[in-house]
Amino acid sequence: MTQISTPARRQVERFLDFSDHVGGLEEADVLALLRDHDITTLEQLVAKAVRAPRSAEPVPADPARTLARPKAATALATARITHPAPAMAVVVDGVEHDPADLTRFDGRPLTYLYHPERLTAVTDDTAVNGALWAAALLRDPRPATRGEVQMFEHVEYAGDWFWCPARQAYNDLTDVHHGPLHLHDWNDVISSMGGTNCTVRYYEHINFGGSSLIVPPFSDIPNLVPSGWNDRISSVWNHG
């Protein structure tokens, strides 16, 4: 048997165990996908896996940044922004709107507050940002016991998944890969997420730009389709 270091062996075993994240796989489907990527030999498969890009790690989230959008996000906010019609009631600035009527806000980012039966949104999130900032300062500095939020590729918590720890953020999900060969990234892929004891904010653009969805603690969301946020998330901020 070939002798390799324990750390190297663990990394190889993690690569070989990737299918645990995606459920049952058919051999023919796997081989067909590999051929699509010009992988027909064991050597080519290993070379591809070794050269695969590494995912970006989440970075510590500074509560003070909650008070103002980063410059990159401000620039993105001036780009074309559209609001998909959710399949639930929506209230904007205290006024209930027909979901299809959200087009009147196209070109302007909205901040949504998630509820399983309705969405509440504001055009000016200054007060919301202040509340999040204050909550972060008053929170116990010890690590949260269930702080990680788990996000899934498909509805009903299916497919691949990844995590974002408490008080951490991913500013660009195009840099966070999934699958053993890292053929895909997590940008505009999230379709459901598990509950955590943290407040989590999801943004439609990278660098925390565009509209955002604030999900309160202990909120399981098995399906993002009704809210209009399915396959729409490009950055994540776990406020802890």
Regions found by a protein language model. Name each.
Residues 2-240:
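Compact beta-sheet-dominated domain cores in extracellular/mature segments
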